[in-house]
Amino acid sequence: MSEMKFYKFNSFNSLVNLSNSILKRFNVKPDHETIKQVDDLLRFSNKVVLLLFDGMGKSQIDKHLNENSFLSHMPKIEIDSVFPPTTVAATNALLAAKFPIETGWLGWCSYFKEKDTILDMFSGKESYGDQVYAGLPQEKVGYKNIIERIKEANPEMYCDSFWPSFSFHNGCSNLDNFISSISNALYDKQECFIYGYWDNPDHLTHDNGVNSILVKDSINNIDKSLEKLCSENKDTLFIVIADHSLIDVKYIVLDQYPEFIDLLKRPFSLEPRCASFFIKEGKDVEFKATFNRLFGEHFLLLSKEEALSRKIFGEGNKHPFVEETLGDYIAISIDEYTFLYHYNEEDTLLVAHHAGGTKEETQLYMYLIKFAR
């Protein structure tokens, strides 16, 4: 049953294929198949803006976008994220134009053999401790992104990116500042490529759940901002996407199952809904039986070999870090249940999450907006 519920993303119609279309348009050899509908539009576009709104996947838009909204009247294509559908894997897949198997960016936290610890990939901080190894993830799995590759192939062309305030490079204090900064950058350009990333509605959905009025307001505010940006820049092709969607979750606290914890070398890594487990020597058979008895109704369990042979992390050459960081087994949520290793009463649990194997988390809308040729 869990096998049937696992949604495998389409590796010919995904975020990676989108970024390869963009590479192709700007004379960079693509690494993977492109998307024909995007290729056809890009052919007539000298100014291209790729905007990613974190967590604004298909299920979120279907639930919250007002009927009379700007985006509801814009042309769109359904595409998939990657697996796992989570920010670390998906945004890096988009920016690298390669699948997670190729980039090594598989999830929020990964095991690093040389430090024998699990680190958060964006910060380098220990996931289950206080030590910080800043720069180590980038050192292991750094890559040249599509902005840099396009600039190399088109040295005279304007290429840039815009971010929330956490970024030292073009960090923007709020949504209005983000939108106006991009509009200002477009003002006098004849040819350009701009990437913009915004971190909502993801944060709001994590904290408040998919049915929250705050999430609805966020998505409709983004919609109004996009209408302003696109109408002020009619000669620009705007490609609007998300990295994933979210679902409300229920938690399974693993350290409440000592017979299961005793089989593990260390806490799980990657993601609570796509968990990587390292197993103690000789405990393989016992682990599989115990896992399936306790959690098999809610999770699909794959061995490392099965996960790789089935190409759940996408097509292409395996990054060396993947072999090191993947545990013996991968457990993929196929419903609302989510792992938590340990729970303290003072912990604030996220209401909604992503990175699992459901269609809701994976499917996206890609909007293609241009008012003039």
Regions found by a protein language model. Give the residues of each.
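Feature captures the catalytic ectodomains and active-site-proximal regions of enzymes
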Residues: M1-R373
